[in-house]
Amino acid sequence: MGSNISKLWAARIATTLAVGLSVLAGTVQGQSFPSKQITIVVPTAAGGANDAMARLVAQGLSQRLGQPVIVENKAGANGAIASEYVAQAAPDGHVILFGYIATHAINPALQKLRYDPVADFEPIGLVAASPTLLVVNNSVKAKNMQELVALMKAKPGSFSYASAGNGTAPHFAAELLKLSTGVDMLHVPYKGSAPAIMDTIGGTTQLMLPSLFTAYPQVKGGKLRALGLVGDKRSAVMPDVPTLAEQGIKNVSMSQWYGLFAPAKTPKAVVDRLNKELNATLAEKNVVKKIEEQGADVETSSPDQMKSLVQRELTRWRGVVAAAKIKAD
């Protein structure tokens, strides 16, 4: 009897010590982090919108963490190459991903990948969000969404929309619009946003649903017209453009969000430190201004809030894939 009690107490003490040592180890790791250069892996090519935002974040983190923070571009496979690379990196916070809706919701909803967007990552925090913007070629006569829907219904199949490729955010947004309104339009996929935008400007396609981040320069320059924001609220960047919901089109909302992710099993203390310095960087007025100038709104979050966002978005877009019968290439 006494021997059993002694063994029970010994087991409890050992468990308590193990938990205590684990917490202590995490705290020590957090205090010593970073011990070397940090790399932010960007899943798109250099010179694009994601790249510009990541470099802005890298500069702020470097100043606050006291170590170089560089950007490494690993474009391809709609973000899967970069995501898989970071998922397999050492879980110490020195290699992190500038992820976005494609890497952690749309691409995984569309097809089975060699990484899990939830299980293989520790969310650090949101960086920004850019609502989807419905833009049309200047020759399209519609001045608002009701007129556009009426035109498309009057001539089914006569309108075509451009996307950055099959399974990309603009493709998903357009299919969501089709499901909600019942319009019939042809999908013309391109290899990237740039040629899709240019052909919409030129009139090869009549409309597109890119992020405001992507379309803002063309709308500002008068090359495209914005008919509505595919988001829950108006944007501070383009406050005069109404949402689709304001124009009577419900259940069509898509915000293209961006954030940082660490590999799974990165210590909580390290993730929390990165989240703290990321949010401090995003609170700087010059950073907010530069992000807004490119057509996005600064958004911050805790790691847990971002994890919940990823889970919600993944569930939602899997439903859209099934309803619209979207297939991967």
What are these model-derived regions, one by one?
Residues 2, 35-37, 180-181, 220, ...:
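An extracytoplasmic/periplasmic, membrane-proximal ligand-sensing/linker region
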Residues 103-112, 171, 176-180, 207-241:
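A ligand-binding cleft/hinge motif common to bilobed small-molecule-binding domains
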Residues 12-25:
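Bacterial N-terminal signal peptides
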Residues 88-94, 101, 108-195, 244, ...:
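Hinge/capping helix and adjacent helix->loop/strand transition within the periplasmic-binding protein
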Residues 1-9:
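N-terminal secretory signal peptides that target proteins for export/translocation
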Residues 30-120, 158-160, 166, 182-211, ...:
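N-terminal (or domain-start) structured segment
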Residues 52, 56, 60, 81, ...:
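Extracytoplasmic/secreted proteins, especially bacterial periplasmic and envelope-associated proteins
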